[in-house]
Regions:
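Extracellular/periplasmic helix-exit of transmembrane alpha-helices
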Residues: 138-148, 152, 249-267, 275, ...
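Flexible loop linkers connecting adjacent transmembrane helices
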Residues: 59-89, 113-115, 119-120, 127, ...
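Alpha-helical membrane segments and immediately flanking helix-loop junctions
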Residues: 80-116, 143-161, 165-167, 179-182, ...
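Conserved small/polar residues in nucleotide/adenosyl-binding loops
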Residues: 379-381
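Selective recognition of specific alpha-helical transmembrane segments in multi-pass small-molecule
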Residues: 132-140, 214-228, 239-259, 292, ...
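Helix-loop-helix module between adjacent transmembrane segments
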Residues: 53, 129-154, 160-223
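N-terminal alpha-helical transmembrane segments of multi-pass membrane transport
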Residues: 19-101, 105, 115-122, 133
Length: 381
């Protein structure tokens, strides 16, 4: 409940009480909005769309998985045309740009938070979300490339706001998406990322958050002032190194606790469908919490259905929408099935769940503690 503040207190005390009042009010508003945005209805709509597309496309993500790998990873070893003119990107630069926005906080802090809130079972529902999310992102990218625009110098640009207007004819809906998408960029794309980075840096090396923020702003400025072409070039070098480094580190951590892996995998599946005793009765509340956390963090991580990735893919120089759409399936597979799973295994193998999440300061710090605990041999299950 929101506590009132009293002006009869000394000025300094009243100021502190006022700050606490507004902070608590903001937290309550945020919690209310969060309950709607990441509530059951919205999450089932997102996942339900993926289910619908999976059925209509004949389970393309599984049926053509090998073809997808040959068309994406395989294309990196074949001679292809470079981006032609303007600020266009190669297909790989486009997917690297999209992955740069998805691989990050959601894979580490988001997954850790989901496990703390929903238990090991949240990992299973995260996998389910990713499987159907592959088709959602595939469809987003196909539409973005099909309905993209070309300016005077041959530069491609597009995204959901363009295919919403041209595909449905409802311009107001496209404008609404653009406005809400701009707002979401601050919360999902900037604040969440920088906050977790700052929290982890402060926890690990004692660097004040202000200095971390300044450093991030400077590094980001050097990239974005070069336009979409510079972003694509930087992402094409940074993302593969970042992903490979994390995958190697994650695999190494798992190998250190390889004997405990079967038990952890078993807990993921059993907890996904477990009925716990609550208040003397047995309810499926634990399953609902695990599903919500798994679905929410899966979507937050791979951004399937959010509309951000199609903007990067629309700038690709590819001429075939379906070909670029396969990169969307690849994105979700790498982001969630591989990287998020590695984070999940590290957290579950480390024993950090025995402590309260608040004792670590942030989800990112808890994930770092998990990796550190295993590496120095102090973990126990």
């Amino acid at each position: 409940m929101v506590r009132p503040f009293f002006t009869s207190q000394p000025r300094e005390a009243a100021s502190i009480e006022r700050e606490e009042f507004y902070l608590e009010l903001i937290l309550q508003i945020n919690s209310f909005i969060n309950g709607i945005v990441w509530g059951p209805i919205m999450l089932f709509l997102l996942v339900g769309t993926g289910v619908y597309l999976t059925v209509r496309c004949g389970c393309l993500q599984a049926r053509k998985f090998g073809f997808m790998l040959r068309s994406t990873l395989g294309s990196l070893f074949r001679k292809t045309d470079k981006a032609s003119g303007g600020q266009n990107l190669t297909p790989f630069q486009a997917v690297s740009t999209a992955l740069a926005g998805t691989v990050g906080t959601g894979n580490i802090a988001g997954v850790t938070g989901a496990i703390f809130a929903g238990g090991p079972g949240a990992v299973f529902w995260m996998w389910v979300s990713a499987f159907f999310g592959m088709m959602t992102k595939y469809a987003e990218i196909v539409l973005a490339v099909k309905y993209r625009q070309v300016d005077g110098d041959g530069t491609h640009f597009g995204g959901p706001m363009y295919y919403i207007e041209k595909g449905t004819g409802h311009k107001w809906l496209a404008v609404l998406f653009a406005l809400l998408g701009g707002v979401a960029c601050f919360g999902i794309g900037n604040i969440a990322q920088s906050t977790e980075i700052a929290g982890a840096m402060q926890s690990l090396v004692g660097l004040p958050p202000l200095y971390t923020g300044i450093l991030l702003a400077i590094l980001t400025a050097f990239v974005v002032i070069g336009g979409v072409k510079r972003i694509g070039q930087v992402a094409s070098y940074l993302v593969p190194f970042m992903a490979i480094f994390y995958i190697v580190a994650g695999v190494a951590v798992i190998l250190l606790r390889i004997t405990d892996v079967p038990a952890v995998l078993a807990s993921i599946f059993t907890e996904a469908f477990s009925f716990r005793a609550v208040g003397g009765g047995v309810f499926g509340y634990a399953i609902l919490v695990a599903m919500r956390q798994g679905f929410a963090r899966g979507v937050f991580s791979n951004e399937a259905g959010l509309g951000s990735a199609p903007m990067a893919h629309a700038a690709s120089n590819t001429k075939e929408p379906v070909e670029q759409g396969l990169w969307g399936i690849f994105e979700v597979f790498v982001d969630t099935i591989i990287i998020c799973t590695l984070t999940s295994m590290a957290v579950l193998l480390s024993g950090v769940l025995e402590n309260d999440i608040n004792s670590y300061g942030s989800n990112g710090a808890a994930a770092a503690a998990a990796f550190n605990a295993i590496q120095i041999g102090r973990a126990h299950v």
